[in-house]
Regions:
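Alpha-helical DNA-contacting segments of helix-turn-helix folds
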Residues: 66-73, 112, 116
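Hydrophobic/aromatic residues within well-ordered alpha-helical segments
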Residues: 62, 69, 73, 77, ...
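Short amphipathic alpha-helical elements of helix-turn-helix/winged-helix folds
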Residues: 26-30, 68, 80, 108, ...
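Hydrophobic/aromatic-rich alpha-helical bundle segments in the mid-to-C-terminal region
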Residues: 117-121, 126-130, 134, 145-190
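Basic, helix-initiating cap at the start of DNA-binding domains
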Residues: 1-34, 38-47, 64-67
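Hydrophobic alpha-helical connector segments
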Residues: 68, 82-110, 157, 183
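Conserved amphipathic alpha-helical interaction elements at protein-protein interfaces in regulatory
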Residues: 29, 33, 61, 83, ...
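Short hydrophobic/aromatic patch on the recognition helix
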Residues: 49-59
């Protein structure tokens, strides 16, 4: 992802960076304590020691705040994909990397399911516009193409990533599906695409 300098944006002011960090920390703490849906943005602003206008100026709406909180975790996974140990990181065959990535993305999605669900319902379609989704899509598309060039790795990557939709994962959990069974199903679909 481009940095502020690369994108031509001015560097963030120190006070703005502090406010952003305080807002994210307050949101993280309140959401962990009471749940994402039970906390208002007014409460987040108050806990962060900033005005509601500052929070809205910085994030715009609830969905943008949720996406900012997810960004930290998504960057960790991106770093592991780019620089981590195999099989998730470079050095493993594409098939092994794809399966390791899908396992890691499932873990991230389940660990932060409530936040993902809130972000997807607060701003429908916004998740597909994020740099993280674009990264996941390019990575999966490339791995599919390298493993066994399918007819359309771009489309197949979207289809495979659809399995990580928070509403779907929530519904599966409510049906009693555990992480292992969902992971097995996702890997089975990936394996079928690779043969």
């Amino acid at each position: 992802m481009p940095t502020a300098k690369q994108a031509g944006a001015r560097p963030e002011r120190a006070d703005a960076a502090r406010n952003r960090a305080r807002i994210l920390e307050a949101a993280r703490s309140l959401f962990a304590e009471r749940g994402v849906r039970e906390v208002s943005l007014e409460e987040v602003a108050r806990a962060a020691g900033v005005g509601k206008a500052t929070l809205f100026r910085r994030f715009g709406d609830r969905g943008a705040l949720f996406l900012a909180l997810l960004d930290e975790h998504e960057r960790e996974l991106q770093d592991a994909v780019l620089r981590g140990e195999p099989p998730l990181g470079p050095g493993a065959p594409p098939r092994a990397r794809l399966l390791a990535f899908l396992d890691a993305l499932l873990r991230l999605s389940l660990d932060h399911r409530e936040l993902l669900l809130a972000s997807e319902t607060a701003r429908p379609g916004a998740r597909l516009q994020t740099g993280a989704y674009a990264f996941w899509h390019r990575h999966v598309s490339w791995l599919l193409g390298e493993s066994r060039p399918p007819a359309d790795p771009d489309l197949l990557a979207h289809v495979l990533l659809a399995a990580f939709d928070a509403e779907l994962l929530t519904a599966l959990q409510e049906q009693g599906r555990d992480e292992a069974s969902v992971g097995d199903a996702i890997r089975a679909v990936a394996e079928a695409l690779l043969h």
